[in-house]
């Protein structure tokens, strides 16, 4: 059965897509639903034809595989530039961006649905031109259509911004150029990923700090279990944030990877190269038929210079670098917040360990006191046992034998106390007891 697609206009009440569909958000904010390879065998080939991606990139964005990788904490974060598309795999922000549309897998996922809505709203807002509220020269942008063609469109940044940036626009030669479609879509994905991670971090902080403070005041099994769960979540979120930060840092350090993300300029470059090659082949055919023109050599040299002047594809990556740097700073701030929370958890653990060590020292001191008392009591019992031996001695026949028993008992008790106090004094001098 052939693959089916339903095109839904932007803003219309479209029915919810079935599980596994890929909503395609276009440059004008419209949405079409492309069937997933789970439902149709030929749909995978259709997605590969539309995006030019290899199967491994589509498998990396598969919701089932992503869920399994996320559960095992080994899911990678990557922004990969291909020939005709950009693969975005940043935590919950998973999308395939082309020069004219954005494909998002698993739209029924509650964590992904806000990304689709944000893409439709932001891309539709960026594609709709609005008149400038001030008489300053209008700022021109580039609007990308469904077919990948580029047409100039006017954009406005609002009254205050236009008035404040009027001189800057004149200095730059007529205003700022609007970002290409793939950069606007990439910005939405980056913002969604950074905001979702920041929201998770804020939620964790609101739960962690009170729980840690309560643990320091009262060490109990319930509080320890809460802190253990918080620490597990902290490790998981820190890993995701670190992966996103590392990917942005890798892109900022590699100009070739950033150049691969310029899809619109790449299409324009390929189109211009095709025209140049076509003209060159026509001129070569014409020169081969015209032997006099070949002997002159003037036109041929000029054509060679034109072809040689084409050079390789090397776009200006300043705009993309500024875009990535802004979100790199944001995700780095989130990572710093998590690092601060991790340090607070470690400080709390150290404080709890010191409290437990203090309690353990007190128990050890109590054990020393009890052991010493037991030793002294054993000595007193030994002396009493000696006097209790059933052996007749002369003391029993003495008239003062009735007064000897209280004296002997008092002497045993006094000797035991003196021996116990002497042991405590020795312990204090040796530093065993405080």
UniProtKB/Swiss-Prot annotation:
Recorded superkingdom: Eukaryota
A GO molecular-function descriptor: magnesium ion transmembrane transporter activity
Topology with respect to the bilayer: Multi-pass membrane protein
Compositionally skewed regions (Low complexity) per UniProt: 9-21
Stretches with biased composition (Basic and acidic residues): 279-291
A Pfam short name: MRS2-like
Function of the protein: Putative magnesium transporter.
Stated name of the protein: Putative magnesium transporter MRS2-D
Taxonomy of the source species: Eukaryota, Viridiplantae, Streptophyta, Embryophyta, Tracheophyta
Gene it is expressed from: MRS2-D
């Amino acid at each position: 059965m052939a693959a089916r697609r339903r095109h839904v206009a932007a803003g219309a009440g479209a029915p919810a897509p079935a599980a596994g569909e890929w909503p395609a958000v276009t440059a004008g904010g419209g949405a079409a639903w492309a069937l997933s390879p789970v439902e149709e065998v030929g749909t995978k080939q259709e997605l590969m034809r539309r995006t030019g991606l290899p199967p491994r990139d589509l498998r990396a964005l598969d919701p089932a595989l992503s869920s399994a990788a996320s559960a095992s904490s080994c899911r990678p974060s990557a922004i990969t530039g291909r020939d005709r598309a950009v693969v975005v795999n940043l935590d919950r922000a998973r999308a395939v961006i082309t020069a004219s549309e954005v494909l998002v897998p698993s739209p029924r996922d509650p964590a992904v649905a806000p990304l689709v809505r944000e893409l439709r709203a932001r891309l539709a807002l960026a594609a709709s031109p609005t008149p400038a509220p001030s008489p300053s020269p209008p700022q021109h942008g580039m609007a990308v259509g469904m077919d990948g063609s580029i047409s100039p469109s006017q954009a406005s940044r609002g009254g205050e911004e236009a008035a404040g940036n009027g001189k800057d626009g004149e200095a730059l030669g007529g205003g700022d150029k609007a970002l290409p479609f793939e950069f606007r879509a990439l910005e939405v994905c980056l913002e969604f990923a950074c905001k979702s991670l920041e929201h998770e971090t804020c939620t964790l902080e609101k739960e962690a700090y009170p729980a840690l403070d309560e643990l320091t005041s009262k060490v109990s099994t319930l509080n320890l279990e809460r802190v253990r769960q918080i620490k597990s979540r902290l490790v998981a979120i820190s890993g995701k944030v670190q992966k996103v930060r590392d990917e942005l840092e890798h892109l900022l350090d590699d100009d070739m990877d950033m150049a691969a993300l310029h899809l619109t300029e790449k299409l324009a470059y390929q189109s211009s190269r095709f025209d140049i090659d076509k003209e060159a082949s026509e001129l070569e055919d014409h020169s081969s038929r015209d032997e006099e023109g070949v002997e002159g050599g003037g036109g041929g040299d000029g054509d060679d210079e034109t072809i040689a002047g084409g050079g390789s594809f090397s776009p200006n990556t300043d705009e993309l670098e500024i875009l990535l740097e802004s979100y790199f700073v944001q995700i780095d701030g989130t990572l710093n917040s998590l690092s601060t929370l991790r340090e607070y958890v470690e400080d709390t653990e150290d404080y709890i360990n010191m409290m437990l060590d203090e309690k353990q020292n007190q128990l050890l001191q109590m054990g020393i006191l009890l052991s010493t008392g037991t030793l002294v009591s054993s000595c007193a019992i030994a002396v009493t046992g000696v006097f209790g031996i059933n052996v007749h001695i002369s003391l029993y026949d003495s008239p003062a034998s009735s007064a000897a028993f209280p004296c002997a008992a008092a002497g045993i008790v006094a000797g035991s106390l003196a021996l116990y106090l002497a042991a405590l004094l020795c312990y204090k001098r040796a530093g065993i007891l405080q």
